[in-house]
Amino acid sequence: MTLTAYYQLRNTKAAGLGFELLTSEPGAFIVLQESSYEKPYEIARYGHNGSAGDRSNAFSCAMNKARSLQNYSGAKLDYNVYEETA
């Protein structure tokens, strides 16, 4: 299992996002809640079959979930999106 960080939503977001969607390896995009004092906690998991369309859709769902949590959470937590592959 490999986790790749694609986007980290911090209190001050860095501009820009870019990664390659042309792969055929199935996996999942995972939203993790992270803080400096606790272990990362999995909030959501969006699986994909590896096709560009399915992967793009799963990533979009994960980003929307992370952004909504970051916007409405009163705590100083980070919600980060990772891709898990075999």
Model-derived regions: residue spans:
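Intrinsic disorder/low-complexity segments, especially N-terminal tails and targeting/processing regions
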Residues: 32-33, 45, 83
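A short, charged, amphipathic alpha-helix used as a generic interaction element across diverse proteins
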Residues: 10, 49-76
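Short glycine-aromatic motifs
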Residues: 19, 29, 67, 72-82
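Surface-exposed loop/edge segments in extracytoplasmic proteins
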Residues: 38-45
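N-terminal compositionally biased or targeting/leader segments
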Residues: 16, 59, 83-85
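Generic short amphipathic/hydrophobic targeting helices enriched at N-termini
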Residues: 26-27, 39, 59, 77
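Short intrinsically disordered terminal tails
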Residues: 1-4, 80-86
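Short N-terminal "domain-start" leader segments
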Residues: 1-38
